[in-house]
Structures are given as C-alpha cells and as structure tokens.
Amino acid sequence: AAEAFRKKDKEAFALHSNRFLEMLRDVDELLRTRPEFNFDKWLTQARSWGDNSEEKDLFEKDATALVTVWGADGDPLIFDYSWREWTGLIDGYYLKRWEKFYAMLQDHLDAGTNYSEKDLPQTHGRESFRANDFYSTLGDWELQFVSTPDKVRTPITQGDEVETATRLYKKYARLA
C-alpha cells in the first residue's frame, strides 16, 4: 500500500490497503478461537479488582492504557510499547487506527495532494504521538478509546481453531 501511495496508484493502493485490513480481521478471527488471546479477558480481570463502578472503570482504563498508549493521558512517549495480539484489541483498536490512516492517505490521493512523514518529529524511531494534525486527531481518538468504560466485548472463544487456521492458511498460501 505504501509503494502504491507513493506512485499515486489508487487502484493498487485500494487493493493493498484493503488486503492488509482484511488480514487484521482474519488475525482477530483466528485469535478469537483461543481464550488466552482475548482482550475482554484482560479487561474483565482488571475490572474485578474494583469495589465499585468508579474503581472498576479506573482499572479498565489503566489496563487499556497499558496495552495501547502506555502511559497517562496527554503525550505518551512510548505508545504501542506493549502491543498485544489479542482478539478484540486488534479488531476494536488497531484495525480502526489503520482504517483511519488509510482513509487519510486515500483523501490525499483523491485530492491530488502530497503527504509525507519524512520530516515528522520522531520518538523512539517512530512518529511522535502528536506529530501532525492527523496524528493529533488519532491521539485524541486513542485516548478516548482508553477512557471509554465497558468497551464492546468479544466472546471468550468463538469458532474452531483448527478449522479457522486451516481455512486462513489456504487463503494466504495462495498469496505467497
């Protein structure tokens, strides 16, 4: 998708960005077959430590921040430090971020404007949390995600892991 964007090839950009988003959905589906890869389990455990709704919400917020922005509200310095491959987190957080990023790039393609991250401020080898207008808006969304209690829950497990893995293997083996 990045190469297609640089070449201003809208058709290839759509193909590759959609393929990547589909892959994230498929990874989330595969992880949903195993209880140990579940974001809801993490949040449920965090909420269990609270004695009242206020404490439960705070523990959920802290547990969410730990695996997303890794820090307090504002300007975390090492966001994504604790990335987890968990169902619910991929579909509910990482996929949505990528959708926003690709939509922003698509807007630039449609408008015929350039976009480059070459000179953006860096923190630990990646774009800073609020490196430009897009990342600032994305940062607001990320902090809102962290602060929202009772996030959409995913079933602890869903689907057969062997069937799902076999189907996805066949799907992606043909792309190699």
Regions of interest found by a model, annotated:
Residues 1-176:
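Catalytic domains of carbohydrate-active enzymes that cleave complex glycans
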